[in-house]
A protein has these predicted regions:
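His/Glu-rich zincin catalytic helix
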Residues: 1-52, 56-64
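Extended aliphatic helical segments
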Residues: 4, 14, 24, 71, ...
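Proteins with a high burden of low-complexity, intrinsically disordered sequence enriched in S/T/G/P/A and R
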Residues: 4-6, 14-17, 79-81, 95, ...
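Intrinsically disordered, low-complexity regions enriched in small/polar residues
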Residues: 9, 20, 27, 85-86, ...
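Generic recognition of cysteine residues
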Residues: 22-23, 79, 121
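Short, flexible coil/linker segments at or flanking structured domains
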Residues: 26, 41, 71-73, 128
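M16/MPP (pitrilysin/insulinase) zinc-metallopeptidase core fold and M16-derived inactive scaffolds
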Residues: 45-96
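Acidic/histidine-enriched segments that form metal/cofactor-coordinating
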Residues: 86-151
Length: 151
């Protein structure tokens, strides 16, 4: 049975917040896709409220593309402690950190949530800009580490 990369991570040893380059996949034609773990909250100790996480997802999805080339997708983790980011190419975590922090600083100045309406979102009523700003402010003050063990 093939292993799931994220399940191989010892969640008891990591120190959030951090940005981790999980892997680089190489396709049959030499194309590369990088996958990143953007961890806001300490695993098994904290979890996003769904409305705040939903607003963070909308802001990240909408605005990360303005700050980073080659974005394929950014998706919330099922455990509600962070997001996965997939990009074309072999990206450097420093570049990812800069882009994510820029989006979060801009979120703090935002007065609305992109695509938070019935047409563009499947659960637009469960979304909180106030909650998203709280998480953004907290992670900006702590800073994302590029060392998952906090050293």
């Amino acid at each position: 049975m093939k292993k799931v990369e994220s399940f191989e991570l010892d969640h008891t040893k990591v120190k959030a917040p951090f940005i981790r380059k999980c892997c680089v996949y190489e396709g049959g034609h030499g194309d590369k896709i990088s996958k990143f773990d953007i961890r806001f909250l300490q695993p098994n100790k904290e979890a996003f409220g769904t409305a705040a996480m939903h607003a963070l997802e909308h802001h990240l999805a909408y605005n990360i593309r303005e700050n980073l080339d080659g974005v394929i997708d950014i998706s919330p983790m099922g455990c509600r402690t962070g997001f996965y980011l997939s990009t074309w190419g072999d990206k450097d975590p420093i570049e990812i950190k800069a882009a994510v922090e820029t989006v979060l600083r801009n979120l703090l100045k935002s007065e609305d949530i992109p695509a938070s309406n019935e047409v563009q979102c499947g659960n637009y009523k469960d979304i909180s800009l106030f909650g998203a700003k709280g998480y953004a402010k907290d992670v900006i003050s702590k800073g994302f580490s590029l060392n998952i063990y906090g050293e």
